[in-house]
């Protein structure tokens, strides 16, 4: 086991504080409408230019191991805020730095660290209730656009495209961000249920220009097994042919004789039919087939529940207004399923999302909700260069998370005003002893840090602005973009309540642990091993000079 280097007390805290300040100083320059860029060197390709706090934090590793521990703890604050609300990483970092700096000053002056931490925790618990009370519901498109704009560093085009996407696919819809091919941002909306399985044979294509299969008002047969024998499908095919409507077969697979017969029937015009594989694998496939059944008002033909393919009747089949199938995707538009059944299924999946532990499972379940309840929108980010594309994509993703948080818990006045108001509401809070009172004051002072940093980045006088805003009430604040004072809600400067709350909670949590640190342990650097001895000359070769 390698030897360790141990530092105690003030020596440890000073080193840790240096690391905190290095990381926080790099991150906080990005805060606010006039936040600056940070350039990140990459081991390959062009450098990345970003205004995203968590991207900057993730890049920082310090050479001094004690300083690095401090930096990594603040990085944890940014990551936790990002995971919880998707935004507010820079605000959380600024708050953590302020609490640690003020708190360690008090510890150096001889205060009890544990009582300081209790005071800070008491102040934060009281403070996070204030934004919740002041929160305004964020339901209309204009407010959503404003939240997106603020989060994307005052880029209104980003706010507008996110608001448009949310309007089209609803709150439960899935919105993804991709790199586009054009200079302008584009929005693609897929209505209905789309899954990534295409036609099983190109001979099903009936729209030659688009290279797709278009079925109008089709029946949909859902089968939870492989089908290779055509005899199993004959009753369903005959029933559909009598009804003179097309048929879409979604099965685990359709192969051999069954597929060949379907192709021949389709080409001869006896019955208009197409077959695709069911989406997903294993249990997820069963669940998605059930989703499609509920959406289209059909049932899944599965031997597990005693349903046989040979005994299928028309009433067992699902229906939709239209189905479009390309080489890669199948889209079912306007299924005829009952609204109550669909809502019940959505509620059931939402419960599974709450119980799910892995992010991957949550993401897949969220996609299923979107396909049942709303739709899927894709924002294609446009830019002139690859460097700009990466920077803009980061901002769009941040803005998207912020708008989701705003829709979930509402919005409060932005620009650091919500924290100033929260601090003013709890200014009379008392701890159990004087040292806890100092902890409360540390937290209250730290809550001014975001507005001070926003003002500083805009090139204005931070103390003047902070005092003017403190003298006001409600949503009165300072618009750093224009240099004007006024009602932040009316000016459209909004922060999601969840983002403000999460930033303060995570910052105080990690900062409290750092204040109560008394020892730090790290590996000693490895000493260079002794090199191999020089190889001497070969003996007996000295007299060879005379042979020349």
From Swiss-Prot:
Together with its co-chaperonin GroES, plays an essential role in assisting protein folding. The GroEL-GroES system forms a nano-cage that allows encapsulation of the non-native substrate proteins and provides a physical environment optimized to promote and accelerate protein folding. ATP binds at residues 30-33, 51, 87-91, 415, 479-481, 495. Forms a cylinder of 14 subunits composed of two heptameric rings stacked back-to-back. Interacts with the co-chaperonin GroES. One of its GO terms (cellular component) is cytoplasm. It comes from the Bacteria. The gene is groEL1. It holds the Pfam family Cpn60_TCP1. It is found in: Cytoplasm. HAMAP family: CH60. Coiled coil: none annotated. It catalyses: ATP + H2O + a folded polypeptide = ADP + phosphate + an unfolded polypeptide. GO terms for biological process: protein refolding. PROSITE patterns: CHAPERONINS_CPN60 (PS00296). Keywords: ATP-binding, Chaperone, Cytoplasm, Isomerase, Nucleotide-binding. Its EC number is 5.6.1.7. PANTHER family: 60 KDA HEAT SHOCK PROTEIN, MITOCHONDRIAL (PTHR45633). This is Chaperonin GroEL 1. Belongs to the chaperonin (HSP60) family. One of its GO terms (molecular function) is isomerase activity. The keyword Transcription regulation does not apply. The lineage of its organism: Bacteria, Pseudomonadati, Pseudomonadota, Gammaproteobacteria, Vibrionales.
